[in-house]
Amino acid sequence: MQYRDLRDFLAQLERIGELRRIRVPVSPRLEMTEVCDRLLRAEGPAVVFERPADGAQTYDMPVLANLFGTPRRVALGMGAESLDELRDVGRLLSALKEPEPPRGLREAGKLWTMAKAVWDMAPRKVSSPACQEIVLEGDDVDLSRIPVQTCWPGDAAPLVTWGLVVTRGPHKKRQNLGIYRQQVINRNQVIMRWLAHRGGALDFREHAIAHPGQPFPIAVALGADPATILGAVTPVPDTLSEYQFAGLLRGSRTELAQCLTPSLAQAQLQVPAGAEIVLEGHIQPDPAHPSGYQHALEGPFGDHTGYYNEQDWFPVFTVERITMRRDPIYHSTYTGKPPDEPAVLGVALNEVFVPLLQKQFPEIADFYLPPEGCSYRMALVSMKKQYAGHAKRVMFGVWSFLRQFMYTKFIVVVDDDVDLRDWKEVIWAITTRVDPARDTVMVENTPIDYLDFASPVSGLGSKMGIDATNKWPGETTREWGQPIVMDAAVKSRVDAMWETLFQ
């Protein structure tokens, strides 16, 4: 599906029955979460809440939710028509990440065509962007005008969830795009929860070292087009900007707007020109804090793990200017025990990961991140095993290949006769092909998800690899079991007589 911006995408979804409008009042406090949770579990449509209201408080701004509630809508957002086509996106990324030298004129021509397609999708800056049709400054900056969801009963405050955070480090040629949740703490401030290894946090750290005591500029785009949002969570090669990749997905160049705040413009921060809402501002200095910048205690919030997370200190982003389109739409979601939108995204992005992994490890037959494992904490790999110890090589290869797998706690490797998408098959392989002492690999003191309260230390924990492949000589001295398989001729004869057996 090709589209210009979020509104064009929503119009196309509505035409094919993938979006519904809710015209009765629904509260952004808890009620929207419950509605969307039921819709997502039923594989229902995206929704626009046209009359958000919380008690006596009403909002003029509609709320878009459950946009990525099915794998098909994720695929449509990435310019594909089905989940299967996302493998092609992965093949494109693998070719861009590690292009192979052409072996002849025909392959050279294909390489040139791909390079030209990437070049033609370079983003372009526009002078009168839709995202700046309305500009709020000074006392008019008030986040309470936006119907930000409070998702769960124990949440500390309303939480911005789909904010596309744009930063640039002092020594970086390109901007970083990231999705980080933001706790609203007053009319013009949010807590920016980014983990230490994420691009935004790294840019901030480099800025604090290079320019201590100077405000750090940030822009947050709310209601960006799906391709740009999904580009921010996809393993785009370092040689390609997320905006350029979004153009490839969408089928048209990404249009960008220069931020209006002078320091943000000086930092060359650019946001999607068609974004519904843009927050411009800074993380301000605070000499009293050890980091030299304002921080606040964030959380607790219900998270994609299905639990409330611990509180921790994160930087405070002060919003100094809000720009928006006329009649803006606020894009929101919730996170909770799978399935939720991050889990659905994980299912879709899984198809993108497979060709990337296969390019590096041709022996991998399939790869699956089960959504029940919080989308990334468990990985299943099937492989064409070629030698003793091969499964362990694949385990460590997966852990180290993409940043997205840094927090994967469990990897189970099976032979290619096992269907990874069928838990019955996986459990059968584990229980029949694994000796716990011989086939379990434990790795201690590795980076782990900050939200993983099961780890002994925040951000540092262990990983487990399980080799559930058939064992080769050198791995066992015993005669290995042969799977029971019915004779093909017998199966064929029974197929032919099946309809007559029960007449």
Curated annotation (Swiss-Prot):
The gene is ubiD. Prenylated FMN binds at residues 179-181, 193-195, 198-199. It is an enzyme of class 4 (lyase). The active site is at residue 303. It comes from Ralstonia nicotianae (strain ATCC BAA-1114 / GMI1000) (Ralstonia solanacearum). This is 3-octaprenyl-4-hydroxybenzoate carboxy-lyase. Binds 1 prenylated FMN per subunit. Belongs to the UbiD family. Its cofactor is prenylated FMN; Mn(2+). GO terms for cellular component: cytosol; plasma membrane. SUPFAM superfamilies: FMN-binding split barrel, UbiD C-terminal domain-like. Its EC number is 4.1.1.98. The keyword Iron does not apply. GO terms for molecular function: 3-octaprenyl-4-hydroxybenzoate carboxy-lyase activity; metal ion binding. It catalyses: a 4-hydroxy-3-(all-trans-polyprenyl)benzoate + H(+) = a 2-(all-trans-polyprenyl)phenol + CO2. NCBIfam families: PRK10922.1 (NF008175), UbiD family decarboxylase (TIGR00148). Catalyzes the decarboxylation of 3-octaprenyl-4-hydroxy benzoate to 2-octaprenylphenol, an intermediate step in ubiquinone biosynthesis. Pathway: Cofactor biosynthesis; ubiquinone biosynthesis. One of its GO terms (biological process) is ubiquinone biosynthetic process. It is found in: Cell membrane. Homohexamer. Pfam families: UbiD, UbiD_C, UbiD_N. The keyword Amino-acid biosynthesis does not apply. It is a peripheral membrane protein.
